[in-house]
């Protein structure tokens, strides 16, 4: 009787575990099926990110919206081992590092170590690399050397930004309004217009303004860190034949404002401008303070005579792309792009508090 009871008990336990495993498997399968597949072009072809043997961080446009990513600088919060810093002279210029390697100079005469591609067009200089993001299809960060497929300036990696393309035969529009700290006000809009049965136009506009976060003690010039950006993008897509597509894009990015700290220092009394004979002695004494005062949560004060003008950037870009479908999952693409920029970069350097020395 005892053996029969034990066998019945074991049989009941086995049936219960089997049902539990089946339910867990079904739940897991549903979870996997519901996951959004992220497509990457890291190898110059569309593939699932899970099939690419490259260290890559890829995000869809929906991912960026849900995470509140509105500017290229924001992606540093999503990508491990990646650092993006603003240039002290112009807030649209970025210093980008991946895995500890990257660019530390934002001047026009220096090449990047990390390439930035926007709609397959290479940005040859860092000016304008901290642009605002809206109506983006996907963003990818490739880590490690990528010279085989993306040419030079990819010693540390590459950043690929692909915007949404015009959709033929469909009208669509969207508007996004954002407000935040320091008087932040941003408005972004998109309109997709079907022109004919084989052509469409997609227009995107962005404006973003924000007050500065550095109180200027000279009393005459603007505070530091002011943001005033305007972006515009128009893309025309024409299906010339069933196999041949023409894409033309015209974009502009205007960024004006005031510089941010090159070296941080809080002034409590009359400032002494850096650069004099005692600069070496002065900077030794204030190194620790400068590091502490660069904490973004602090309240900055400084002295900066900006009578020579604020920072600005006017960047105009054009893109022409012809894509021919060869069949058998193969395409032939011709891409031609131009970029013209006019900018002025002014920065604030470390000063000294006379009472401290």
Located regions from the model:
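Outer-membrane beta-barrel translocator/receptor signature
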Residues: 111-113, 125, 134-143, 148-218, ...
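Short structured motifs
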Residues: 80-84, 188, 304-305, 318
